[in-house]
Amino acid sequence: MSAISGIFNLNGEAVSPVLLRRMTDTIAHRGPDGEGFYTDSFIGLGHRRLAIIDLSPAAHQPMATKSNQFVITYNGALYNFLQLRAELAALGHEFSSQSDAEVALYAYKQWGEKCLDRLNGHFAFAIWDKTRQTLFLARDRYGVKPFYYTLVGPHFIFASEQKAILTHPEVKREIDLEGLLEYFTFQNIFTDRTLLKGIRLFPPGSYAFLPLSPISHQLRTTRYWDFNFQEPATPAPRQEYIEELDRLFRQAVNRQLVSNVELGIYLSGGMDSGSITAIAARRLPYIKTFTCGFDLHSASGLELGFDEREKAEYMSYLF
């Protein structure tokens, strides 16, 4: 759980390093292992780091290519970054770290926005193209990583949390009544609205190019992925579905076990976290699991039925 932040003044006004730092400091809890800043006149990028892959200073962000044309601030985890790194190295790219953020950076340099079709994982990042003076923004397919933004006049401001955006003096603290209505109706917000007027959630499975422009102050997003539930013309035998689900599930779990720090699993008594634990424990014996519970001394019979601690404890002993 790292954090990103940034300011892009589309009218060419210089970004205040003090303001950028203040924004990034508000989300320091997301990245206790380091901070970094990049400013170049009208563009500023901030980062708070939670080190998981490559714990060395070489993986410090914001990170630039050797030519300094591209600069990235990235929050995420790429599960296929080792394969992509090998592919990019074969194409002539040289890496300065072992991080997945640098792989995302050079993947964009090599393939542009088409790199998103190759990234397997969850992420939210911004890449500044110094030559074209254009900011590239992208978010993972399911919107796992948070990415908020606002456009106030010529000021484009983004961050991993809304409170960082509120630090900017041009952003007003106003309730979005439509967002509030949506939340009270559905107990969730399914559009790009938030509870704060003017602050939007960058859509999942999407990207955007934002060029320096003193005239046009609009962000147009493009969808690069969406769900496809199309049924096959001829259904396969049931056993084939079982075997394919088993293969894909094991692949998904094993891909996420790459880390330079100790891994753990939130374990409930359900079959989802239990199944993940069973697969992960085959590669990482005695993996640590964590289960949360509440004092149920005065709980009703119905409430006691939701307590899964006993089942979770049993599963933790198994693995």
Predicted regions and their residues:
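Cysteine-centered catalytic environments shared across enzyme families
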Residues: 1-319
